[in-house]
Amino acid sequence: MAQNSLRLVEDKSVDKSKALEAALSQIERSFGKGSIMKLGSKDSVIEIETVSTGSLGLDIALGIGGLPKGRIIEIYGPESSGKTTLALQTIAEAQKKGGICGFVDAEHALDPVYARKLGVDLENLLISQPDTGEQALEITDTLVRSGAIDVLVVDSVAALVPRAEIEGEMGDSLPGMQARLMSQALRKLTASISKSNCMVIFINQIRMKIGVMFGSPETTTGGNALKFYASVRLDIRRIGSVKEREEVVGNQTRVKVVKNKMAPPFKQVEFDIMYGEGVSKTGELIDLGVKAGIVEKSGAWFSYNSQRLGQGRENAKLFLRDNPDLLREIEMALRQNAGLIADKFLENGGPESEGDEAADM
């Protein structure tokens, strides 16, 4: 019997560092320079670039100042909760920094007028309305591999219909086909996304599982692959309405960070999404200011540095809207107290909170 050429070297005199250098050089010759390196070396340490979500509170709750580039993001929630609005605000923030963005509209439901109101530059926004799920994911793969895209949104995973389902008869049962499609696509995409430093945001819908006795019956579409590959998962919910007298002018929204590979998860933040405007910056700054102790609240009155902002939240919002310099001053003070505010977000957002079971299923 031939003796195995590979054997464990037990001789203590063998220099381990030389053996390691030989192994590393062999790997680099086979797979190219940079295929393996020490994590702490100057060449390998890369600071994570982020893109703001358009919400200061959510940027703070994410722990790194926004959504990370070169990663997969999932935004999910019920209908009309603000999923597409949040994605479009992220695109608008990326475009302000000169980034190139794309929108794969699988639902064929993007409203360009609303997108423009949120600050999206439509002239420089790439949009595709594919016919099948395979086509949508192939377009996504091509755009990511180009290395020229900063933010790419896929709206939505539920609308990525496999070609076999479209070509088949209405009522045909094709179990697991969409999940297999997503699993294969994410296996291909994940390395390209990291190398190209492109952020890919998947918008997802919620479904109810039948026969669930304990825990939340909610689950997201497209199987479990996206839950594993996503670095950040955001659960967005509408929790109330914003009214001016009797007219509803916006939604009160809660976003929970149910998964975060970049910072501690389970933080949640609340803000207003105003119709035709997007995230209400003034309302959010007032709420965050009160939490951080920067804006004082006495009864119904709000004040900052002994200057009264208004009686009632809506009046204070109007005052700040008319005084942009004061608005910027409060925002700068809040950014300096970001660590304190982040701790406040954990008060109601532990892993035992309602709705987390849906993220774990």
Curated annotation (Swiss-Prot):
<dbReference type="GO" id="GO:0006281">
    <property type="term" value="P:DNA repair"/>
</dbReference>
<comment type="similarity">
    <text>Belongs to the RecA family.</text>
</comment>
<dbReference type="GO" id="GO:0006310">
    <property type="term" value="P:DNA recombination"/>
</dbReference>
<dbReference type="InterPro" id="IPR003593">
    <property type="entry name" value="AAA+_ATPase"/>
</dbReference>
<dbReference type="InterPro" id="IPR020584">
    <property type="entry name" value="DNA_recomb/repair_RecA_CS"/>
</dbReference>
<dbReference type="GO" id="GO:0005524">
    <property type="term" value="F:ATP binding"/>
</dbReference>
<keyword id="KW-0233">DNA recombination</keyword>
<keyword id="KW-0067">ATP-binding</keyword>
<dbReference type="GO" id="GO:0005829">
    <property type="term" value="C:cytosol"/>
</dbReference>
<dbReference type="InterPro" id="IPR049428">
    <property type="entry name" value="RecA-like_N"/>
</dbReference>
<comment type="function">
    <text>Can catalyze the hydrolysis of ATP in the presence of single-stranded DNA, the ATP-dependent uptake of single-stranded DNA by duplex DNA, and the ATP-dependent hybridization of homologous single-stranded DNAs. It interacts with LexA causing its activation and leading to its autocatalytic cleavage.</text>
</comment>
<dbReference type="GO" id="GO:0009432">
    <property type="term" value="P:SOS response"/>
</dbReference>
<dbReference type="GO" id="GO:0003697">
    <property type="term" value="F:single-stranded DNA binding"/>
</dbReference>
<dbReference type="GO" id="GO:0140664">
    <property type="term" value="F:ATP-dependent DNA damage sensor activity"/>
</dbReference>
<dbReference type="InterPro" id="IPR049261">
    <property type="entry name" value="RecA-like_C"/>
</dbReference>
<keyword id="KW-0547">Nucleotide-binding</keyword>
<dbReference type="GO" id="GO:0003684">
    <property type="term" value="F:damaged DNA binding"/>
</dbReference>
<dbReference type="Pfam" id="PF00154">
    <property type="entry name" value="RecA"/>
</dbReference>
<keyword id="KW-0227">DNA damage</keyword>
<keyword id="KW-0742">SOS response</keyword>
<keyword id="KW-0234">DNA repair</keyword>
<dbReference type="InterPro" id="IPR020587">
    <property type="entry name" value="RecA_monomer-monomer_interface"/>
</dbReference>
<protein>
    <recommendedName>
        <fullName>Protein RecA</fullName>
    </recommendedName>
</protein>
<keyword id="KW-0963">Cytoplasm</keyword>
<dbReference type="Pfam" id="PF21096">
    <property type="entry name" value="RecA_C"/>
</dbReference>
<feature type="binding site">
    <location>
        <begin position="77"/>
        <end position="84"/>
    </location>
    <ligand>
        <name>ATP</name>
    </ligand>
</feature>
<keyword id="KW-0238">DNA-binding</keyword>
<dbReference type="InterPro" id="IPR023400">
    <property type="entry name" value="RecA_C_sf"/>
</dbReference>
<dbReference type="GO" id="GO:0016887">
    <property type="term" value="F:ATP hydrolysis activity"/>
</dbReference>
<dbReference type="InterPro" id="IPR027417">
    <property type="entry name" value="P-loop_NTPase"/>
</dbReference>
<dbReference type="InterPro" id="IPR020588">
    <property type="entry name" value="RecA_ATP-bd"/>
</dbReference>
<dbReference type="InterPro" id="IPR013765">
    <property type="entry name" value="DNA_recomb/repair_RecA"/>
</dbReference>
